[in-house]
């Protein structure tokens, strides 16, 4: 590849949470999108991944979550709206409590997907599917 093919705005560092309740995984999606992803968001300078995950859930869903064990790192490169993107996802266990998880943002929505249906639900990147499917037996909230 040429240097121009690697031009990116930067590699994004993102904290993501795996929250399983009743055999279902909490996911987030842009409204109208056929794909979904684990909830979370960008880590700001000076934050830990756990702090960023808790902050993002407060901002996006208005809830306080408990972050748990570190589950892994997922690299992801993709095209979006004609632009190259690259991200490093730090994935943590997350407990969102017993209440409903509703977006405070007008462009995203939260939902629950059965652990056996992560592929059909369009969970991306695909590496999240293995982490999510493994989650049910290991740390259901």
Please place each PLM-identified region on the residue numbering.
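Short connector loops at helix/strand junctions that flank enzyme active sites
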Residues: 12, 20, 38, 65, ...
């Amino acid at each position: 590849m040429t240097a121009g093919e690697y031009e990116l705005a930067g590699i994004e560092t993102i904290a993501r949470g795996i929250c399983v309740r009743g055999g279902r995984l909490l996911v987030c999606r842009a409204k109208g999108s056929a794909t979904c992803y684990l909830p979370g968001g960008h880590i700001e300078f000076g934050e830990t991944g756990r702090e960023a995950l808790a902050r993002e859930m407060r901002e996006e869903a208005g809830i306080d979550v408990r972050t748990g064990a570190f589950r892994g790192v997922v690299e992801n490169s993709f095209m979006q709206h004609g632009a190259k993107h690259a991200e490093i996802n730090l994935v943590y266990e997350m407990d969102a409590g017993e209440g409903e998880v509703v977006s405070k943002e007008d462009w995203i929505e939260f939902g629950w997907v059965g652990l056996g249906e992560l592929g059909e639900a369009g969970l991306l990147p695909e590496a999240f599917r293995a982490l999510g499917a493994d989650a049910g037996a290991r740390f259901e909230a």
